[in-house]
A protein has these predicted regions:
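Conserved catalytic core of the tyrosine transesterase superfamily
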Residues: 1-314
């Protein structure tokens, strides 16, 4: 059995169960590109190890994601008789330290939105206006980048201040309320980007300079340029600099911090946040609780240091 048809068979099987399976499918196709469309019999443990380690050649959180995806694929292939045994490492390495996402501050946003138009290269896929609007949408809604990029005109209800999010990670649609400020941002953006006479309006709200849907890779690449231009950097030991996906983490943590400060029962509110974010279950949302408590603790510590410093100078 060749690898390519087996992978396609497996992806169709997972999608038939109601899962879009986009991210794991991308990993399997990367595995196929690396090994080529070989027979299962030609696969070796070395091929699998090389894919798991990736280009960096070291164990990261991506190693465990790839391991999980390949494990599911090999179990499926074994059940279909494509292979006799799974070709995964017998020992699991120690997990790397927990990844800590970057939480954007209002000052970070001011810097990102304040980069002058003249600093943008004409070759950038996204115009300055589109880039700023995309950042405001992500910051104000916590949407995944792909969800924001796929948002269609008919899915924006200005009267009800509501977005309809379809084609989600888990194949479920959801309604996302938005604030008045973001409604104004989107309404003005649409007015500025009305199609010229004789041209059709692009199906998606946000588009590239040539009227195409925004691709994740293009947006990520342009954001890394913008982040450096704006001086938004992290100086801790994290492997990654701030990313577009961190706006989703920022939204979740900011919402939890607000509830804590309002004296709300955060545990009872957590299912609402889980639904809003389109999570598969509450466990996925619970990871933000520890992160939020750490942020509040650090904020309290900073406040105490400030107070004591003022007393010392009195």
């Amino acid at each position: 059995m060749k690898l390519a048809p087996a992978i396609e068979d497996f992806i169709r099987y997972k999608q038939a169960l109601g899962n879009s399976y986009t991210t794991p499918a991308r990993a399997l196709k990367a595995f196929l590109r690396q090994t080529g469309d070989v027979d299962f019999d030609e696969l070796s443990a070395h091929d699998v190890d090389a894919f798991l380690l990736g280009h960096g050649g070291r164990v990261t959180s991506a190693w465990f994601h790839r391991y999980s995806v390949l494990g599911c694929f090999f179990r499926f292939s074994t059940s279909r008789g494509y292979i006799q045994h799974r070709m995964l490492p017998s020992s699991i390495p120690e997990k790397p330290p927990r990844f800590v996402p970057y939480i954007y501050s209002t000052e970070d946003m001011r810097r990102l939105l304040g980069v002058p138009d003249s600093h943008y290269s004409p070759t950038c896929p996204l115009s300055p206006d589109t880039m700023r609007t995309l950042l405001l949408v992500l910051y104000g809604t916590g949407l995944r980048l792909g969800e924001a990029a796929r948002l269609k005109h008919e899915e924006v209800d200005f009267r009800r201040s509501m977005l309809t999010i379809r084609e989600t990670k888990f194949g479920k649609s959801r309604l996302v309320p938005i604030g008045r400020d973001l409604v104004s941002v989107l309404r003005l953006y649409r007015m500025r980007h009305r199609p010229r006479f004789g041209y059709e309006r692009p199906p998606t709200v946000l588009t590239t300079r040539i009227g195409m849907m925004i691709g994740n890779d293009h947006a990520d690449h342009q954001f890394q340029w913008l982040r450096k231009e704006a001086g938004v950097l992290r100086f801790d030991t994290a492997r990654y600099q701030p990313r577009l996906h961190d706006f989703r983490h920022t939204f979740a943590v900011t919402r939890l911090v607000t509830w804590y400060r309002e004296g709300k029962d955060v545990q009872r509110m957590l299912p609402l946040l889980s639904t809003y974010l389109g999570h598969c279950g509450i466990d996925e949302t619970s990871v933000y609780l520890q992160m939020t408590r750490e942020l509040l603790q650090e904020a309290n510590s900073r406040f105490e240091r400030y107070v004591f410093a003022e007393v010392d100078h009195a």
